[in-house]
Swiss-Prot record:
Protein name: Gag polyprotein
Alphabetized SUPFAM superfamilies for the sequence: Retroviral matrix proteins, Retrovirus capsid dimerization domain-like, Retrovirus capsid protein, N-terminal core domain
PANTHER family per UniProt: ENDOGENOUS RETROVIRUS GROUP K MEMBER 24 GAG POLYPROTEIN-RELATED, IGE-BINDING PROTEIN
Gene it is expressed from: gag
Site for Cleavage, residues: Y155, H156, A166, T167, G177, S178, M239, P240
InterPro entries documented for this protein: Gag_M, Matrix_HIV/RSV_N, Primate_lentivir_Gag_pol-like, Retrov_capsid_C, Retrov_capsid_N, Retrovr_matrix
Pfam short name (any one): Gag_p24
Extent of Basic and acidic residues compositional bias: 112-141
Length: 453
């Protein structure tokens, strides 16, 4: 485990900078993952296939226990692993296109297995009707015969003069490399066999140290996929739902964004403009009920979460009332299919309970927009109730308080109040003039009129 911790710590320092977790935090996270059965060994963390299950398990643990330490560490580690993997792929692609390496030796076929025996028969002087080399020469496209020169022995039979295989051309040497571009591995072999490889299909590649073949990453023509999806009908706009060739598929929210938002809530509070800006950015695109409820569980305490659920239900009831009056309401799917209801909007209908994939497939775009907008409005209401802003009129600079701290307290209180945005700046300037220390008040009075109004 120590070796894995050192590797991960080094990657985090490279890609996370000052926010990189300590070796102790990484070790605690690995121990927890092994204890929960998510990793058989610490080195399994390098496998991208294990990342999504780990993210889901740690997110669930953070929501149940209210402890996000391991989730935060995992978010940083996951970001470093993805960055390192992306950098490696980019480097491999560059090396391949520049001719600095790449490719792999093709697995031996029937011809290459027969070739040594045929060459042994030629060395013994046996007559062979058609050698493997000659068959290769017939099959290889656009190969030219290599001219023989006097005094040069043939590399097939060793004869200097009168070589019977003088017109036989040697097959090109295999392109030996380290597999730096595995997604192109096996393309030549499949084309040589006359098979048509569909665009975007995965090609088999050889894993180092293994004789068998394992599936490798695919190169997908996303422009063609987008055209095909556009021709089949309107795409699902839910985020984080990814549209694939087989239909919409759900993917978890990025752990780094969730942990950063949770840290902002703890440091700045719910009413902070920074917190509200991050929440609005995260919910700028429609989300599934599964993601909305789990996100609120992470950033809200038990009591605020209960208040949010009630406020969200009230907002959804408003949507249902509007959809009942208008059969062509967006939540009703423009009159196609059944009308929306509370169970559908909360993700509690048949096929949706605890199933984000089912929600992505069954919910309409208009329902997803209504779900997210209602959740955001409910969050704003809970923020005002859970953290009432202190009266800005009572804030005064203390005897030993710096002006910067006093200004921060005042600005936070004014921005969290119900004052209209146009009135906040004049109120702040007026409080600076009346509530600060006498020497600061003198400086403000002596300032140009553009400062103190």
């Amino acid at each position: 485990m120590e070796a894995v911790i050192k590797v991960i710590s080094s990657a985090c320092k490279t890609y996370c900078g000052k926010t990189s977790p300590s070796k102790k935090e990484i070790g605690a996270m690995l121990s927890l993952l092994q204890k929960e059965g998510l990793l058989m060994s610490p080195s399994d963390l390098y496998s991208p296939g294990s990342w999504d299950p780990i993210t889901a398990a740690l997110s669930q643990r953070a929501m149940v226990l209210g402890k996000s330490g391991e989730l935060k560490t995992w978010g940083l580690v996951l970001g470093a692993l993805k960055a390192a993997r992306e950098e490696q792929v980019t480097s491999e692609q560059a090396k391949f296109w520049l001719g600095l390496g790449g490719g792999r030796v093709s697995p031996p076929g029937p011809e290459s297995i027969e070739k040594p025996a045929t060459e042994r028969r030629i060395d013994k002087g046996e007559e062979v009707g058609e050698t493997t080399v000659q068959r290769d020469a017939k099959m290889a496209p656009e190969e030219t015969a290599t001219p023989k020169t006097v005094g040069t022995s043939c590399y097939h039979c060793g004869t200097a003069i009168g070589c019977n295989c003088a017109t036989a051309s040697a097959p090109p040497p295999p392109y030996v490399g380290s597999g730096l571009y595995p997604s192109l591995a096996g393309v030549g072999e499949l084309q040589g066999q006359g098979g048509d490889t569909p665009r975007g299909a995965e090609q088999p590649r050889a894993e180092p140290g293994h004789a068998g073949l394992a599936p490798g990453p695919a190169l997908t023509d996303w422009a063609r996929v987008g055209e095909e999806l556009a021709s089949t009908g309107p795409p699902v706009v839910a985020m984080p739902v990814v549209i694939k060739t087989e239909g919409p598929a759900w993917t978890p929210l990025e752990p780094k964004l969730i942990t950063r938002l949770a840290d902002t809530v703890r440091a700045k509070g719910l009413r902070s403009p920074i917190t509200m800006a991050e929440v609005e950015a995260l919910m700028s695109s429609p989300l599934l009920p599964h993601d909305v409820t789990n996100l609120m569980r992470v950033i809200l305490g038990p009591a605020p979460y209960a208040l949010w659920m009630d406020a969200w239900g009230v907002q959804l009831q408003t949507v249902i009332a509007a959809a009942t009056r208008d059969p062509r309401h967006p939540a009703n799917g423009q009159g196609r299919g059944e009308r929306t209801n509370l169970d559908r909007l909360k993700g509690l209908a048949d096929g949706m309970v605890g199933n984000p994939q089912g929600q992505a497939a069954l919910l309409r775009p208009g329902e997803l927009v209504a779900i997210t907008a209602s959740a955001l409005q409910a969050f704003r209401e809970v923020a005002r109730l859970a953290e009432p802003a202190g009266p800005w009129a009572d804030i005064t600079q203390g005897p030993s308080e710096s002006f910067v701290d006093f200004a921060n307290r005042l600005i936070k209180a004014v921005e969290g109040s119900d004052l209209p945005p146009s009135a906040r700046a004049p109120v702040i300037i007026d409080c600076f003039r009346q509530k600060s220390q006498p020497d600061i008040q003198q400086l403000i009075r002596a300032a140009p009129s553009t400062v103190h109004g």
